[in-house]
Amino acid sequence: MASPGASRGASAATAAAASPRPPQGRSSRRDKYSVLLPTYNERENLPLIVWLLVKSFSESSINYEIIIIDDGSPDGTREVAEQLEKIYGPDRILLRPREKKLGLGTAYIHGIKHATGNYVIIMDADLSHHPKFIPEFIRKQKEGNFDIVSGTRYKGNGGVYGWDLKRKIISRGANFITQILLRPGASDLTGSFRLYRKEVLQKLIEKCVSKGYVFQMEMIVRARQLNYTIGEVPISFVDRVYGESKLGGNEIVSFLKGLLTLFATT
């Protein structure tokens, strides 16, 4: 029997699937975009983010697939994903679960093995990253022929919403320190909303050794080392509505250790 989250997801997904497809968008018909969505306890958020993704891609006539990598969520996220896969079809929604929580970096490694697009988009499944920015990412990539396009909270009209002052100070402080120590050539080193050429992401994954949230930081640092080009698009980051943040004391300690390791080795 489907979970309540799956039922809500089915209704939203059916509405999105019924939306008409307007004229051709800005991306080439030959291009395909694979979205990697790592999930852990995202039953409430998953139907909404998938609905928004489908809406954004459909309105822009962009060829896409959404790959859900669930790490053994105990809240029924996998069952919701199975329902979404049935609604949209396995050519659009690909559930590629793992049996337990193995970390963000390895989730991307697992997901890219199943990606058939020539571009890969990584983003959070908790609604912190709105899919409405994806067409802007694609336009930016085409205009500058960039290898990577990264969403930034710290440039132009970018910003963070829903965080208290303490968390904003910690985020700004962490980003400032990374800019001083690593000089990454990007304004938002810890962000996780990005578009990559598939072959570039594969190469970076081979080079990166970090785990968890530090993985995102190392990806940009290694990209600079390999002379990959990076474009940026200002985004609005909104704190999650459903569920709890996975950023805790252990993640902060890991971040500091990872920062020092990257400083010493790059």
UniProtKB/Swiss-Prot annotation:
Q: Which GO terms describe its biological process?
A: dolichol phosphate mannose biosynthetic process; dolichol-linked oligosaccharide biosynthetic process; GPI anchor biosynthetic process; protein O-linked mannosylation
Name where it's found. Answer: Endoplasmic reticulum
Positions of GDP-alpha-D-mannose binding: P38, Y40, E42, I69, D71, D124, A125, D126, R153, R240, K246
Residues binding Mg(2+): D126
- Its top-level enzyme class, in one word, is transferase
InterPro entries per record: DPM1-like, Glyco_trans_2-like, Nucleotide-diphossugar_trans
Q: Which residues bind Mn(2+)?
A: D126
Enzyme Commission identifier(s): 2.4.1.83
Its Gene Ontology cellular component terms are:
endoplasmic reticulum membrane
Q: Which residues carry this modification: N-acetylalanine?
A: A2
Please provide the record's keywords in A-Z order: Acetylation, Endoplasmic reticulum, Glycosyltransferase, Magnesium, Manganese, Metal-binding, Phosphoprotein, Transferase
Annotated region Disordered: the residues are: 1-31
One GO term in the molecular function aspect is: dolichyl-phosphate beta-D-mannosyltransferase activity
Bias class Low complexity marks the residues at 1-19
- To which pathway does this protein belong? Protein modification; protein glycosylation
According to UniProt, the reaction catalysed is:
a di-trans,poly-cis-dolichyl phosphate + GDP-alpha-D-mannose = a di-trans,poly-cis-dolichyl beta-D-mannosyl phosphate + GDP
Record text on cofactor binding: Binds 1 divalent metal cation.
Q: Which domain of life is it from?
A: Eukaryota
Q: Give the modified residues of type Phosphoserine.
A: S3
Q: What does this protein do?
A: Transfers mannose from GDP-mannose to dolichol monophosphate to form dolichol phosphate mannose (Dol-P-Man) which is the mannosyl donor in pathways leading to N-glycosylation, glycosyl phosphatidylinositol membrane anchoring, and O-mannosylation of proteins; catalytic subunit of the dolichol-phosphate mannose (DPM) synthase complex.
Write out the similarity annotation: Belongs to the glycosyltransferase 2 family.
UniProt-recorded name of the protein: Dolichol-phosphate mannosyltransferase subunit 1
Provenance organism: Cricetulus griseus
The gene designation is: DPM1
